Amino acid sequence: MILHPSLASANPLHYGRELTALDNLDFGSLHLDIEDSSFINNITFGMKTVQAVARQTPHPLSFHFMLARPQRWFNALAEIRPAWIFVHAETLDYPSETLTEIRHTGARAGLVFNPATPIDAWRYLASELDGVMVMTSEPDGQGQRFIPSMCEKIQKVRTAFPQTECWADGGITLAAAQQLAAAGAQHMVIGRALFSSSDYRATLAQFATL
């Protein structure tokens, strides 16, 4: 299992300290949720903060854009060489064009689906996608509890997009991770389960063995 710690779940007063604590740990990428309240009711990181994080961390960066116009960020992001950029299917008028713009940054391109969004209408993009991310909780600020039925959606993604890498994000505890791994998830974004633990290395090791 490839893990991606989500910095938005860390204590915002201690981001520098948290980055240092992650420096020597083994995981796929440091995950940054970019939110500006245009798509969900929250604000996370601006470009100055993203650039500061990129300067400090030795890890690759993955980005999850939870905003209405992610394309405005791509030129600036290209300078920090992102590993992955995910955008929400629900926000895109011309998804193929957006995926091409993502690749121009040097990043791998992915689509994100909220729990209520069906995936079938997007199968025509299979050859253009590197990854598909399933939101396994509602990104609504109401507790973001894991939705067990999203395991079925993970299975559908593995069938509909067999050449892409399957990600899960949202409310992932160790118990939820076991279910998601059994369903076929290859990558997991972990937030509170990691940053609320007392031993980051041990917590990552527990998840990684799934």
Swiss-Prot record:
Annotated CDD domains: RPE (cd00429)
Residues binding substrate, per UniProt: S6, H64, D140, G141, Q142, G143, D169, G170, G171, G191, R192
EC number(s) on file: 5.1.3.-
Textual note on the cofactor: Binds 1 divalent metal cation per subunit. Active with Co(2+), Fe(2+), Mn(2+) and Zn(2+).
Record flagged with keyword Isomerase: yes
UniProt entry tagged with the keyword Zinc: yes
Residues involved in a divalent metal cation binding: H31, D33, H64, D169
InterPro entries with a match to the protein in the record: Aldolase_TIM (IPR013785), Ribul_P_3_epim-like (IPR000056), RibuloseP-bd_barrel (IPR011060)
GO terms for cellular component: cytosol
Enzyme class (EC, first level): isomerase
Keywords: Carbohydrate metabolism, Cobalt, Iron, Isomerase, Manganese, Metal-binding, Zinc
GO molecular function term, any single one: metal ion binding
Cofactor(s) needed for function: Co(2+); Fe(2+); Mn(2+); Zn(2+)
Annotated PANTHER family: RIBULOSE-5-PHOSPHATE-3-EPIMERASE
Role: Probable pentose-5-phosphate 3-epimerase.
NCBIfam families in the cross-refs: PRK08005.1 (NF005944)
Stated family: Belongs to the ribulose-phosphate 3-epimerase family.
Official protein name in the record: Protein SgcE
